[in-house]
Amino acid sequence: CSGFWYFDCDENSEIVNANWSHEFRKMLGYHDTLDFPNKLESWSDLLHPQDKERVMVQLQAAIKDKTNQIKYQVEYRMRMKDNQYQWFRASAEVIRRLDGSASRIAGIFINIDAEKKEIMQAQKSAAFHRAFTKADLCEYYVNLEANTFDTFKVEPSLMTVFEQSHTWDE
């Protein structure tokens, strides 16, 4: 899923108007301008607290860069209408006046939640594997007669502890 958005900027490159497409609102679980108004805060207030500053700094850097060398391409989490967070990727281009000031920034918004969760699960599995092998929390069984090799035998109670431990956001 993807949605379109744009911001109009004044002569000082300050955002004065925001516009969100119907698809953009729908991806977040909203319906129209009544429950998701065309305001910057409608979007920025839903950014995950750990992502908000980074996202806003990147947006301002892209808007203020009169050379267009700084691109707005960022991944972040947003709170959906159901209060769950999902991952999104935003990419935009800045349209400039002759003096280089931003006139409009227009972009696309893509839901990458499934992709991010798949990557995080792979990282989690790799981390568990490293923890098991480096901490000798597993056993290796080689049966030469049957030509078999079993790599893990972790106590169920220990596996539960590892599965319940979280060292990063999911």
Residue ranges and their predicted role:
Residues C1-W43, A127-E170:
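PAS-family sensory domain signal
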Residues D113:
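Acyl-donor (CoA/ACP) binding surface of acyl/acetyltransferases
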